[in-house]
């Protein structure tokens, strides 16, 4: 365990502890201690093995969060297999009978695993904190590979801090001062050293984790409140008060009856009109080959809110389009459009040879300019089709005229100015993300609470014994140290209580129904809902 050497007949300050009294325990007392510790050890092993198997068989659990929990389960499994049983044997026998090498190996393994648990909790806390406070920048870097690197560093730091000192200290000082029938860390015989290791290995990490969790909790509550305000502002009554007649998005339009056009499509885009006062318009020259100028447009929403019929047909002003494009358009010789560029690019085409037979393709002015590689965002506009007097060119495309559609752009970047359906989808997505964040925060809070409850009593005794070496009874030392081990038993229970997927997977594995469930799912996708 971290920061202290009570694996032996000495307390943290080096005062000898008489284990002979333990040898005089009654038979039933020994049986009770052995049975209780064996049950706790078995629960620890089974619980953490279930965590590992669940992570292996259930793909839903293979998230970045659970990679850290998997590492924590590995440390807890080591404690459940080795530390609990060896320490119980040492207590009941009253002496160490396995030799000095086995003692040093056990202490190194115990301290490395215990410190790795603390380091993993620190990593989990920082991961949650950055995920909440820096969702855009941090989550892009939050990959399983990076999680593996952080986990490896946690174990490496724990190993470097404890293993060399425990295994090599006797060679550095020239002799082994630990008696043959005792098992303790030689360099932790001084109270001041033990006190310093307890501060560095427990109190500082706990303080950091507590501060991080408080900030995580505040940020999560703030997001919950913001989401509630967003849902309230997007109520049905408020949606009805809006003026959808001033907002239009077109599905996609313009197609020439050439079957090879679809094969030439490379990018998707939408168009949006800017206000006429932002730029001047010009008249484009006619393109000689339209096939290279058609790009497929994905449906954004229904074009049902613009004024229609005669009002549109009578309009004669040239359309003004604001290019907010992030897509590279290769330069095509022989095609020119009259454009004007400021900080943003504005294009004003008056199409002459376009078709509106099927709403699949639209003419893109990006063919006239070589733009930097970027993605296109939504453009807003309306389409006017002159039904009478339409003419066809040699390419088989009819005349169409595009008129700007008024679209009030909200200065507020929230979803209030969006289409109600789109706003609902965005709100739903935010709610789902928030639910996941709250679940992860709940799991973290349960793990931290269990860690603090189980480790604090022992580390308080470490501080007390530094100033009063005979104030802590031997039995209390044993209970406090064993309670630190119990934390490894509680952690898998926390996962099951706070994570429904873990809980369901644990249940299926314990009932030996996991293979049956996989077969049922396979048959379900084949059209059967039950096993024959």
Swiss-Prot record:
Short name of any one Pfam family annotated for the protein: 7tm_1
Going by the UniProt annotation, this protein carries glycans at: 8
- The membrane-spanning stretches of this chain are 30-53, 67-87, 105-126, 147-169, 192-214, 444-464, 479-498
Which cysteines link up through disulfide bonds?
103-183
Q: Where in the cell is it found?
A: Cell membrane; Postsynaptic cell membrane
Q: Indicate how the chain sits in the lipid bilayer.
A: Multi-pass membrane protein
Task: Identify this protein by name.
Answer: Muscarinic acetylcholine receptor M5
The organism encoding this protein is: Mus musculus
């Amino acid at each position: 365990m971290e920061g202290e050497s009570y694996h032996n007949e000495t307390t943290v300050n080096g005062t000898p502890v008489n284990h002979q009294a333990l040898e005089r325990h009654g038979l039933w007392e020994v049986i009770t201690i052995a049975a209780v510790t064996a049950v706790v050890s078995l629960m620890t092993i089974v619980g953490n093995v279930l965590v590992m198997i669940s992570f292996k068989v259930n793909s839903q659990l293979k998230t970045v969060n659970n990679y850290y929990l998997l590492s924590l389960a590995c440390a807890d499994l080591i404690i459940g297999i080795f530390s609990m049983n060896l320490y119980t044997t040492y207590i009941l026998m009253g002496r160490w009978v396995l030799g000095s090498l086995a003692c040093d190996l056990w202490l190194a393994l115990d301290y490395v695993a215990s410190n790795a648990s603390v380091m993993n909790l620190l990593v989990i806390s920082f991961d949650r904190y950055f995920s909440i406070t820096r969702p855009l920048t941090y989550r892009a870097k939050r990959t399983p590979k990076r999680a593996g690197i952080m986990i490896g560093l946690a174990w490496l730091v724990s190993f470097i801090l404890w293993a060399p000192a425990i295994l090599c200290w006797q060679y550095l000082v020239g002799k082994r001062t630990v008696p043959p029938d005792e098992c303790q860390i030689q360099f932790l015989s001084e109270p001041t050293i033990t006190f310093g290791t307890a501060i560095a290995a427990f109190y500082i990490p706990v303080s950091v984790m507590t501060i991080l969790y408080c900030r995580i909790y505040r940020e999560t509550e703030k997001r919950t409140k913001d989401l509630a305000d967003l849902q309230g502002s997007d109520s049905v009554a408020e949606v009805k008060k809006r003026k959808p007649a001033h907002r239009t998005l077109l599905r996609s339009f313009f197609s020439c009856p050439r079957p090879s056009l679809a094969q030439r499509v490379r990018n998707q885009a939408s168009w949006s009109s800017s206000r006429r006062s932002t730029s001047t318009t010009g008249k484009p020259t006619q393109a000689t080959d339209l096939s290279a100028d058609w790009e497929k447009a994905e449906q954004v929403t229904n074009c049902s809110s613009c004024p229609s019929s005669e009002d549109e047909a009578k309009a004669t002003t040239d359309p003004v389009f604001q290019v907010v494009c992030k897509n590279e358009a290769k330069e095509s010789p022989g095609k020119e459009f009259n454009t004007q560029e400021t900080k943003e690019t504005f294009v004003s085409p008056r199409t002459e040879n376009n078709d509106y037979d099927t709403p699949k393709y639209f003419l893109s002015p990006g063919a006239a300019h070589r733009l930097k590689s970027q993605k296109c965002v939504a453009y807003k506009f309306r389409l006017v089709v002159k039904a009478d007097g339409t003419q066809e060119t040699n390419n088989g495309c009819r005349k169409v005229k595009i008129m700007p559609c008024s679209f009030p752009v909200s200065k507020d970047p929230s979803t209030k100015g969006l289409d109600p359906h789109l706003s609902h989808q965005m709100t739903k997505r935010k709610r789902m993300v928030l639910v996941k964040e709250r679940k992860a925060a709940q799991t973290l809070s349960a793990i931290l609470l269990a860690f603090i409850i189980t480790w604090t009593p022992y580390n308080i005794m470490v501080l007390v014994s530094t100033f009063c070496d005979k104030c802590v009874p031997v039995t209390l030392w044993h209970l406090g140290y064993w309670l630190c081990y119990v934390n490894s038993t509680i952690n898998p229970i926390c996962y099951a209580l706070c994570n429904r997927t873990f809980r369901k997977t644990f249940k299926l594995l314990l009932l030996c129904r996991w293979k049956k469930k996989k077969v049922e799912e396979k048959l379900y996708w084949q059209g059967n809902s039950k096993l024959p």
